[in-house]
């Protein structure tokens, strides 16, 4: 490298004028692009050897300063080359990573998101269908429950009516029982009356017989004995006929009353038995309907509990799906932001690379110019054109870059600026 520096220093003599013409504000580290206008200096007709010593001294001084400047430039150039290589490697790595992200990850993530979204939508549709089915079943059960409640109300009304009828039948049975007891008491009183009348009749008959016997004895004693046997027989026959007719009438009246009371009691007993049978049937039906109602209430409570659980589970799953969707959207947004950041970094690296390429090209032009002017004698430059190029880079879609290029040209003569022009190229796609 030292040998290269010395050789480069020996080859060029006019670089001092170039560097001095740039001035302290135009250091080469700012990387402007220089273009030197072609000059044709006038050749002297004679060579004045009296100036050789002064020229040799100036030449040595110039060569020393040129060597120092060239060594510094070579060091800076080497460091820039290494930096460019490092940045190119990083650029390649980032470009490969960016291409990989563009080629694979978005598609894979999009497929994953689409699959998860399809699955979540499918599960949401299933849950919606299940919820609708459960609502229909709930409505059906509610309708069945209303029907059963109406039936229960009807059966309750029938039971109340049967209980009212049973109470009426019981009252009638009680009245019939009271009537039967009254009739039995009347029958007993009539039997007692018959017995009393019979005793009275027998007593009267006995007294009459005694009277007849006394009259017969008295008659036999006083007068002649009349024919009283026939009269007595007739009287006895009359009394026996009257007593027999009274007994028959009393027995017939008793039998008719007893038959009527027996028929009424049997009818009332049959009605009571039917009422008891109907009450037992109603009681069994009421028990069965009560059991059915309790079973339906339990089924309704179970279905309502299942429906609430389904609604709560549906709400939880919907909330989890919404959270998953929000999380996926956040991840997608973060990935987009990360990709945008990578693109921005890649753009910044491209800008740095472009600036370094411009700087390298500037150094290459300088070195080539120095090597091409190795055979030109020492002269002063009367004209110097300085061209500066600035870039404003914009990123466009689909991986292309759009830049604004500004070219500034400064023409100098004898250290004075005689022309300053500026040209701008907008939206140049690269």
From Swiss-Prot:
Family matches, as InterPro entries:
IF_conserved, IF_rod_dom, Intermed_filament_DNA-bd, Intermediate_filament
The UniProt entry, under Pfam families, shows:
Filament (PF00038), Filament_head (PF04732)
Coiled-coil intervals? none
Does Protein transport count among this protein's keywords? no
The record's keywords, sorted A to Z, are:
Citrullination, Coiled coil, Cytoplasm, Intermediate filament, Methylation, Phosphoprotein
Taxonomic lineage is: Eukaryota, Metazoa, Chordata, Craniata, Vertebrata
| Chain intervals for the UniProt region annotation (Coil 1A) | 70-101
Under the heading PROSITE patterns, the entry gives: IF_ROD_1, IF_ROD_2
Linker 12, as annotated region: 212-227
Per UniProt, residues of the IF rod domain are 66-374
Q: Which domain of life is it from?
A: Eukaryota
Posttranslational modification: Phosphorylated by PKN1.
What tissues harbor this protein? Brain; isoform 2 expressed at 20-fold lower level than isoform 1.
State whether it acts alone or in a complex, and with which partners, per the record. Interacts with SYNM.
Region called Tail, residue ranges:
375-430
* Linker 1: region residues: 102-112
Q: In the record, which positions carry Citrulline?
A: 33, 267, 403, 413
- Primary role: GFAP, a class-III intermediate filament, is a cell-specific marker that, during the development of the central nervous system, distinguishes astrocytes from other glial cells.
Region ranges (Linker 2): 250-253
Name of this protein:
Glial fibrillary acidic protein
Q: Which residues carry this modification: Phosphoserine?
A: 12, 35, 79, 266, 320, 382
Q: Which family does it belong to?
A: Belongs to the intermediate filament family.
Q: Does the keyword Metal-binding apply?
A: no
List Phosphothreonine occurrences by residue.
7, 40, 107, 147, 380
What GO terms in the biological process aspect are recorded for it?
astrocyte development; Bergmann glial cell differentiation; D-aspartate import across plasma membrane; extracellular matrix organization; gene expression; intermediate filament organization; intermediate filament-based process; intracellular protein transport
Organism name: Mus musculus
Location of the region described as Coil 2B in the Swiss-Prot/TrEMBL record: 254-374
Omega-N-methylarginine-modified residues are 11, 20
């Amino acid at each position: 490298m030292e040998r290269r520096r010395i050789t480069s220093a020996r080859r060029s003599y006019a670089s001092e004028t170039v560097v001095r013409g740039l001035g302290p504000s135009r250091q080469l580290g700012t990387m402007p692009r220089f273009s030197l206008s072609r000059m044709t200096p006038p050749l002297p007709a004679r060579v004045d050897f009296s100036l050789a010593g002064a020229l040799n001294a100036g030449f040595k001084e110039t060569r020393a300063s040129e060597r120092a400047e060239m060594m510094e430039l070579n060091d800076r150039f080497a460091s820039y080359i290494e930096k460019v290589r490092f940045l190119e490697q990083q650029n390649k790595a980032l470009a490969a990573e960016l291409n990989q992200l563009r080629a694979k990850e978005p598609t894979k993530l999009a497929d994953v998101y689409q699959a998860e979204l399809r699955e979540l939508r499918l599960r949401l549709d299933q849950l919606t269908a299940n919820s609708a089915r459960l609502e229909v079943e709930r409505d059906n059960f509610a309708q069945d429950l209303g029907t059963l409640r109406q039936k229960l109300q009807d059966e309750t009304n029938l039971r109340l009516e049967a209980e009212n009828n049973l109470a009426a039948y019981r009252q009638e049975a009680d009245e019939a029982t009271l009537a039967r007891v009254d009739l039995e008491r009347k029958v007993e009183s009539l039997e007692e009356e018959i017995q009393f009348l019979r005793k009275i009749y027998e007593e009267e008959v006995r007294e009459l017989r005694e009277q007849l016997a006394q009259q017969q004895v008295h008659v036999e004693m006083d007068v002649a004995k009349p024919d009283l046997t026939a009269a007595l027989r007739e009287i006895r026959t009359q009394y026996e006929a009257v007593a027999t007719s009274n007994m028959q009438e009393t027995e017939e009246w008793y039998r008719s009353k007893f038959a009527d009371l027996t028929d009424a009691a049997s009818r009332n007993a049959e009605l009571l038995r039917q009422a008891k049978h109907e009450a037992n049937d109603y009681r069994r039906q009421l028990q069965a309907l009560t059991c059915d109602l309790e079973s339906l209430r339990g089924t309704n409570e179970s279905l309502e509990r299942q429906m609430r659980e389904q609604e709560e589970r549906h709400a939880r799953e919907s909330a989890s799906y919404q959270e998953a969707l929000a999380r996926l959207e956040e991840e997608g947004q973060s990935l987009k932001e990360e990709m945008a950041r990578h693109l921005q970094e890649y753009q910044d690296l491209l800008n740095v690379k472009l600036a370094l390429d411009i700087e390298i090209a500037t150094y290459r032009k300088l070195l080539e110019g120095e090597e091409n002017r190795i055979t030109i004698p020492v002269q002063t430059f009367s004209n110097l054109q300085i061209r500066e190029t600035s870039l404003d880079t914009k990123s466009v879609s689909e991986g292309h870059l759009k830049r604004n290029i500004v070219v500034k040209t400064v023409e100098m003569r004898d250290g004075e600026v005689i022309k300053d022009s500026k040209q701008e190229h907008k939206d140049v796609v690269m």
